[in-house]
């Protein structure tokens, strides 16, 4: 993996983590249950004015800073996680499944927040299994199979349908969506600890020879 053309090794990752690169975890349980929200968002830098600015942007009242995580609603907790990530004006935000357990309205609100972050010039890498939600905010989508990218396509290609996509797994993914009646793909993904050589999809591929 490279970041700004430099290999993102362990030493480089320590340098940019939390500064250039921020991470938003899947679970709101990431928040420390014994620490007030404001202190967690401010972190070691202690920039309370920046914290107030970020809270205002994400419609979090000043009094939220004095609350503990258990006092927050699901939507508020998600916004607190986003606020934590943008505190230091990171260049890249990685969000791991940021919408589980949220109703559609809150999920779309969360994704729209990411869209605004991206439009401001920050890179956003959104990890999700929900294609329909991703299609509403992404520019490009990378399709993973057994931990490997098999295709990177423009959102328009997914909207056009399977004929605009190239890899058989991407096409199968579209077939499996609710609007396509959940058409099942026979077979199983290879075990991560025993990956075969060559194409990981070959045993399930409709184009194999």
Where are these regions (language model features)?
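A short, surface-exposed alpha-helical micro-motif characterized by mixed small hydrophobic
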Residues: 134-136
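ABC ATPase NBD coupling module
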Residues: 2-22, 158-162, 194-196
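Short catalytic/signature loops enriched in Gly
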Residues: 154-209
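Q-loop/switch helix immediately C-terminal to the Walker
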Residues: 27, 33-47
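Conserved ABC ATPase signature
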Residues: 68-72, 76
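H-loop/switch region of ABC-family ATPase nucleotide-binding domains
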Residues: 128-129
């Amino acid at each position: 993996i490279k970041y700004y053309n430099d290999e993102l090794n362990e030493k480089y990752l320590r340098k940019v983590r939390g500064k250039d690169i921020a991470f938003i975890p899947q679970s709101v349980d990431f928040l420390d249950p014994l620490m007030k929200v404001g202190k967690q968002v401010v972190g070691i830098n202690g920039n309370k004015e920046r914290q107030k600015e970020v809270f205002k942007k994400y419609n979090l009242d000043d009094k939220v800073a004095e609350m503990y995580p258990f006092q927050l609603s699901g939507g508020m907790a998600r916004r607190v996680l986003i606020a934590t990530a943008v505190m230091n004006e990171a260049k890249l935000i990685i969000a791991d499944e940021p919408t589980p357990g949220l109703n559609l309205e809150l999920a779309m609100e969360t994704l729209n927040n990411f869209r605004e972050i991206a439009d401001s010039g920050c890179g956003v890498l959104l990890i999700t299994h929900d294609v329909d939600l991703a299609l509403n905010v992404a520019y490009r989508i990378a399709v993973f199979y057994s931990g490997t990218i098999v295709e990177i396509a423009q959102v328009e290609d997914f909207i056009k349908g399977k004929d605009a996509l190239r890899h058989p797994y991407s096409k199968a993914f579209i077939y499996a969506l609710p609007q396509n009646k959940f058409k099942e793909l026979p077979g199983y993904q290879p075990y991560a600890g025993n990956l075969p050589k060559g194409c990981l999809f070959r045993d399930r591929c409709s184009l194999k020879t």
